[in-house]
Amino acid sequence: MSRTWCQTIAAALFICSAPIAAASAGENGLCEREMARAARIHGIPLGILYAVGLTETGQRGALHPYALGAEGQTLFARNVSEAVTSFETMRQKGLRLIDLGCMQINHYYHGSNFESVQAMFDPAKNVDYAARFLKELRAREGSWTMAVARYNAGPNNDPAQKRYVCRVVANLVSSGFGAWTEQARSLCQPRTT
């Protein structure tokens, strides 16, 4: 991945690197409450964690603990029982890459780090795992921008990483945790003439 576009986006992500209060829109939500705790415990900027969560399961400004994502589609189950049943149905249909919970943790790659599928839908466990994973990615990659890029798209997928980072930055800005920098705007927003 080009370090140039990463450095451009870093300016936008840097804005939210100071400790900040929980997002008022999600203060009563299960996922949001756990984000404030995980950000504090793991030293992750809440704005980044929240913007990643919004990108993953955000709908009308709230995150969803019982979301499932597979093959580009997201299903919002009403409760954990319905979510687990939906997961089992997806698996019976042959789907392997299924993302679960508040932060859409991929079961295929990360499921062995949880005691069960049901545990992956637990907001405290899901968000805590995502926070630790982002922190690990930042240590390995050297910046929050690259950590965010790798969170969803993994390595060797520059176009998907760029799209994902731009979506996270847009959510960072729309949630009030950051502001567009000129460099981030020029990278993420197509010019209209």
Model-identified regions with their sequence ranges:
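Bacterial N-terminal signal peptides that target proteins for export
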Residues: M1-I9
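Catalytic glycan-binding domains that act on GlcNAc-containing polysaccharides
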Residues: S24-T193
